[in-house]
């Protein structure tokens, strides 16, 4: 005789099968898209937290968790830039992201256009990470209303941009072991 938990579990598995089938093609398309940006050497050495964010951002993108992609990709970028600044004795360990971008700019750590993209993504990410006033033009609601775009489409565009930038930073600051 099955328990109530087993019955619920069976129903959940059936529902998940339907959901998996419904989203499979979109996941496949996202995996193909990611493969054009994702390039890694055989072995990567780095801080476990930083590398875990890289992996988690990929998982989140594949599954369509676009806000998570933005948060994880930008956290990865922040960690990587700060680590580079510290390694070059240009900064202390604790520097905020905006200041790290400024230091990277003034010390030519990364390409100016890439740093501009990073800073814009930081502005887009901030309302998810830090409470903002209702009239802040970078809040999620204000952005999709002003752009006259479906919220989910905008989130996916932002996630794609964050993912691209994450891998551009990864490639630019990758060091040979």
Range-by-range predicted roles:
Residues 71, 75-115, 135:
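Flexible secondary-structure boundary motifs
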């Amino acid at each position: 005789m099955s328990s109530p938990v087993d019955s619920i579990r069976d129903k959940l598995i059936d529902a998940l099968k339907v959901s998996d089938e419904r989203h499979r093609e979109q996941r496949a398309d996202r995996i193909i898209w990611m493969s054009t940006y994702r390039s890694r050497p055989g072995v990567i050495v780095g801080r476990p937290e930083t590398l875990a964010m890289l992996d988690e951002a990929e998982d989140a993108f594949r599954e369509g968790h676009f806000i998570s992609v933005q948060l994880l990709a930008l956290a990865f970028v922040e960690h990587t830039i700060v680590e580079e600044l510290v390694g070059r004795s240009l900064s202390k360990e604790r520097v905020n992201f905006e200041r790290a971008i400024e230091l990277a700019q003034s010390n030519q750590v990364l390409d100016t256009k890439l740093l501009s993209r990073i800073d814009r993504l930081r502005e887009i990410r901030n309302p998810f990470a830090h409470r903002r006033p209702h009239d802040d033009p970078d809040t999620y609601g204000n952005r999709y209303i002003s752009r006259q775009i479906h919220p989910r489409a905008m989130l996916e565009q932002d996630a794609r941009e964050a993912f691209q930038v994450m891998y551009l930073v990864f490639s630019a600051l990758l060091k040979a072991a």
